[in-house]
């Protein structure tokens, strides 16, 4: 009897432990379902561009801006070009062989462009922020030793980053402060969080409440994508929602986000901006390239149906003004297919779609 009782007791103890561990596992799964990022199954990805006719580019009504390093009147320099979505009708908007213009961003109404200009040589070079009309006329300098500007959703303000050093640097994260420029008053207002530094690739959410940016080695972050309160000091790491990488961009309706997860992967996800901090759902890879190449600089089309990005050899520099021979502008329809819309490889990077104010194919901006 003693031996029988001992075996039974041992069996009950083991069964109890098994039940206990099973309950812990179930509770963990429930917690994961509610608290962890929801990652969808991957769509079928192609590691090389598809033939151009696989996406009907001609039906896309929006133009695209991009930076490119090429010959201008017998001199190699960076210029800002505009093209149709199918790659036709290339127009040089800047045409300044003695300056370098880069990082174009179209205003929400499609009438203006903000960008950066490098002037000078060597370490005496200075990067400044400008804006101009979409046809290249009436250029206005708004900040010296500044970089990576973006528009407010109403097109009345431009956010930009101050340079970290007085001496010129090509590092994208060489930034020290976020500043808001009011186009009506001409005033420069520092962001409430004055500790922001080493952030780059900023974008302003359509509801006007958030900035999204990448950070490198700043504010106790290594590499991350951050959500920053536009009118407060709060900073939230999007990694808790499965967002890792750099250079985020939001759709015009504020419902989706895209970013580069690695040098070879681009992602999209649903985003909820209604709460006290943004939440990300349904993370999905949409582009993956060969390890010998890179994909960078994502930008949603105004109707949210396409994403433009840069693609080229891994030896190219993805930073603003970084030489990237062989790089071209590409477009994906979010189905896994992507095509090149430029083919000359003239260091073509940083694409940005130009909205059409009268277009009825996408929702109006939030009021």
Q: Each predicted region: which residue ranges?
A:
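Aromatic (phenylalanine/tyrosine) cluster motif
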Residues: 4-5, 20, 34
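Sequence signature of WD/YWTD-type beta-propeller architectures
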Residues: 35-367
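Generic alpha-helical structural signal
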Residues: 7, 24-25, 79, 343
